[in-house]
Amino acid sequence: MSADPTLIPASPSEDDYVRQVREATPPPLLSEEDPFALFAEWLEEAGKKEPNDPNAMTVSTVDADGMPDSRMVLLKDFDARGFVFYTNTQSAKGQELNAHPKAALLFHWKSLRRQVRIRGTVEPVTEAEADAYFASRARHSQIGAWASDQSQPLPDRHALEKRVAEMGLKFGLGKVPRPPHWSGYRITPVTIEFWRDRPFRLHERLVFDRADGGWTTKRLFP
């Protein structure tokens, strides 16, 4: 028995498909003028939705052989000058950034289905900036910065705990100064790309490129 052709739904027309896509997608990105304002807006939204560390970001560098290296760190500050994080400057990432002062950042907010990719040049923050941020850290974190030879071989967990205890005794109840090997890096972006999920994998990509002291924008195919 053949099927009744009247019971088989007709394939949607091109106009029907376009209408479905438009009805299912959110409005376009609001700002195409200031990437930092748009980033601040997205970060604020992430702070309300992400269960942990909405300021977490991947920092990608290259080593002496050109081999890429990535790790998660926490964004601690940003403004029109760039994006700042703090670390042990003798760590693997610190040495790589000192030798090759360029980096890529990636923010991925799964709860929002959004990501931001940043590429730029790197420079150390000022001594005053590093001192101010270190002073704001919890005391145990300050002591940990002295105790950990970050990225160096560790014989066992006890060795680290012993170092922490030794540093705790050394500083007692007094102020813990910032270690000379602990500071921050600022990534000054040359490119910032905002990506937002849309139905049917027709995602939205908006790219800001630095040019003549300002920004140019372009959209990319998903």
From Swiss-Prot:
Pathway membership: Cofactor metabolism; pyridoxal 5'-phosphate salvage; pyridoxal 5'-phosphate from pyridoxamine 5'-phosphate: step 1/1; Cofactor metabolism; pyridoxal 5'-phosphate salvage; pyridoxal 5'-phosphate from pyridoxine 5'-phosphate: step 1/1
Alphabetic keyword roster: Flavoprotein, FMN, Oxidoreductase, Pyridoxine biosynthesis
Cofactor(s), names only, from the UniProt record: FMN
Chain sites annotated for binding FMN: 71-76, 86-87, 93, 115, 150-151, 195, 205
Cofactor details (free text): Binds 1 FMN per subunit.
Binding site for substrate: 76, 133, 137, 141, 201-203
Annotated InterPro entries: Pyridox_Oxase, Pyridox_Oxase_CS, Pyridox_Oxase_N, Pyridoxamine_oxidase_dimer_C, Split_barrel_FMN-bd
A Pfam family matched in the record: PNPOx_N
PANTHER family: PYRIDOXINE-5'-PHOSPHATE OXIDASE, PYRIDOXINE-5-PHOSPHATE OXIDASE
Summary of the function given for this chain in its UniProt record: Catalyzes the oxidation of either pyridoxine 5'-phosphate (PNP) or pyridoxamine 5'-phosphate (PMP) into pyridoxal 5'-phosphate (PLP).
Assembly: Homodimer.
Name of the molecule in the record: Pyridoxine/pyridoxamine 5'-phosphate oxidase
The organism of origin for this protein: Caulobacter vibrioides (strain NA1000 / CB15N)
